[in-house]
Amino acid sequence: MKFIDEARIEAIAGNGGNGSASFRREKFVPFGGPDGGDGGRGGSVFAQADRNINTLIDFRYAKKHVARNGENGRGSDCYGAAGEDVTLRMPVGTLISDMDTGEVIADLTEHGQLVCLAEGGMGGWGNLHFKSSTNRAPRQQVDGKPGERRMLKLELKVLADVGLLGMPNAGKSTFISHVSNARPKVADYPFTTLHPNLGVVRVDHEQSFVVADIPGLIEGAAEGAGLGHQFLRHLQRTGLLLHIVDIAPFDENVDPVAEAKAIVNELKKYDETLYDKPRWLVLNKLDVVPEEERAARVKDFVKRYKWKGPVFHISALTGEGCRELVYAIKDHLAALKAEEAAALAEPDIRLDDRLHNVDRDDSKA
């Protein structure tokens, strides 16, 4: 299936049905009172997150989604039927925003999450509501309200804990296929990966994390060159970026340090927030380097790159160094979750001070 991670749709809710202005007319009851029923509410358009869907391709071609109108009220106190709702199933990780106002309507982050995109109009009142002691035969009724109509932008940002960053052919797909259950296409030419791949890395029976592999970046990606710029948004939800570098390129004219710097520059141009995320350097393809030269090669790269953060050297092909990297990632993610939990549990000191001041003022009074 083709991977589509952006779409534009129109959601049109149903109009409410009109209220009825009718009177009871039966044999031997020539002047019965009002019996006009209310109109039914219009159908609404909902979005629901579904973990079994991983692309927005259905919305690339079906752009207009219309809910039914509510039925009009009728005599004999008959209320109009409500219009049928429309529920659109979308991938988990879809961000929905209003194209006219720019407002973010919803961020579907959990399976089953249900959000109203366009609300149906309320049904109008029948003349039964207007009966009073002074107006026994009201002829007024209320028309139904129109339903909402919205132009919406859908953006899919995959939910992953770790994102892989690097030049084409750096070995990202080989790495994710070695450590996870993902089976991306792997070949010895650039741009083998054409869309994001997700892999679940199981550390043990109870612990796992999700890795996202996006197409490789090239210089000028932030301005639209290559493929990777289209998919950088999929790294925005991650808690850690792995910058994978081919430390032993076949072309001797290629400088791995220059390529690594180019990737980081593209990242900064695209999104400062993404640039500021925790990032680890992973030097890949050490199996190609003679064992006696590896330490010197790594040391030289780190020195010329002026890198101060964590460094890992692996061979994604043979698996050398991958286990240590996986366990380091697990510990890092666990620490992040612990920090988030502590931040949520931390009391609001300012609120406590305000409450204390209120109590003190009350005691003075």
Curated annotation (Swiss-Prot):
GO terms for cellular component: cytoplasm
Keywords: Cytoplasm, GTP-binding, Hydrolase, Magnesium, Metal-binding, Nucleotide-binding
Enzyme class: hydrolase
Pfam family, one: GTP1_OBG
Annotated binding of GTP, by residue: 166-173, 191-195, 213-216, 284-287, 315-317
Coiled-coil region(s): none
Ranges for domain OBG-type G: 160-334
EC number(s) given by UniProt: 3.6.5.-
Principal cellular location given in the protein's record: cytoplasm
Single Gene Ontology MF annotation: GTPase activity
Domain of life: Bacteria
Single Gene Ontology BP annotation: ribosome biogenesis
Cell compartments where the protein resides: Cytoplasm
InterPro entries named in the record: G_OBG, GTP-bd, GTP-bd_Obg/CgtA, GTP1-OBG_CS, GTP1_OBG_dom, GTP1_OBG_dom_sf, OBG_GTPase, P-loop_NTPase
UniProt binding sites for Mg(2+): 173, 193
Keyword Metal-binding assigned: yes
Annotated ranges, domain Obg: 1-159
Cofactor: Mg(2+)
Family: Belongs to the TRAFAC class OBG-HflX-like GTPase superfamily. OBG GTPase family.
Protein task: An essential GTPase which binds GTP, GDP and possibly (p)ppGpp with moderate affinity, with high nucleotide exchange rates and a fairly low GTP hydrolysis rate. Plays a role in control of the cell cycle, stress response, ribosome biogenesis and in those bacteria that undergo differentiation, in morphogenesis control.
NCBIfam families: Obg_CgtA (TIGR02729), PRK12296.1 (NF008954), PRK12297.1 (NF008955), PRK12299.1 (NF008956)
Assembly notes: Monomer.
The protein, known as: GTPase Obg
UniProt organism field: Cupriavidus metallidurans (strain ATCC 43123 / DSM 2839 / NBRC 102507 / CH34)
Encoding gene, per UniProt annotation: obg
